[in-house]
Amino acid sequence: KGTDAISVFVNRKGELEITGREPRGPVYAAYKFLETFGVRYWSPWRETVPKASSLAVRDDFRLDHHPPFDWRSGWSVSDCGDSPAMRAWRVKVGHNGSVPADCGGPYQFTYGETITYRYMKPKDHFDAHPDWYAYVEGRRQPTQLCASSKGGLDAFTAEIRAELQAHPEKRFVSLVSADNDQFCQCPGCRKIRARLKGGNAALEVHIANEIARRLGREFPDVQFTVLAYWTKEDAPQNARLEKNVAVGLALGHPHNLPVSKCRVWQQKAAGWEKLARDRLYIWDYYAGFNNFNEPRADFVNIAETMRHYARRGYRGVSAQLALGRTANFGELKAYLWAQFAWDPSRDI
């Protein structure tokens, strides 16, 4: 049971069965089985494969595992590109955010910024409909959408409907605001903030709920995502999320501690758990973005942080790690993160 569950065992005929939940489980099962013989996939460029003339398992051998996270996707020196070696490594370590079709294809979760970038592009609408966009510093600006603009929401709904009709395979659609803090301050949006008792996140939640209500019956298998990030970290206190709205958590925290020991992080996460406990996906950080080569001991917190996410029942995990072949412990962090994303309980 569960996304990407695997099972390896000796059946009654004495045959070794290597299987798992389709579409990716059987492939993961094969690689995890090899790990029991000492094979290690350290990075796309480094592996350990012990030499042996034969392999044998006991009749009672059994390897069963159900990853606690449905979605597991890193962004690191080991998997930030699309080279054949990186594509293969992602499969070997159990990532599923970007998987080739011949290995089962990806788990297509998304929570990247899309508003004004992918949808409702100002070059298409702003000149004719400035009222659809944010009122900032006394004038309409193409920085964000105006959450209280009926015309803007109608146009946004039409764009999302058209995309889902063109791509019926989609299961997640990101409705995340542009990566800036220039949110609408018009009277209508101020009322939304007051009603939901929230800041900028209240506007994103309002937009997502509107889209989710309008399109939910037409596309019942689709989830719409928002992102708790930067000026949107605090959950609106008086909001409810539609059942087809999921949340990404990109909450800042001290990197020298696991999140289970970060009081502020836990307070912010608790606010979102009240809204969508079974629909939370993590966007984490294990890098110093001013200098990837800067020594940082944050990799020692990966295990406990991932165990905390699993205990809380979060649905998926992703992380931005250091990039560049000379990055501080870059390959080691990527390997450890992948191992604990697959099984947070393991001891490495």
Predicted features along the sequence, with ranges:
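Feature activates predominantly on carbohydrate-active enzymes
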Residues: G2-H206, R213-E218, G248-L249, E273-A297
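Substrate-binding groove of N-acetylhexosamine-processing glycoside hydrolases
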Residues: Q141, Q165, A194-I348
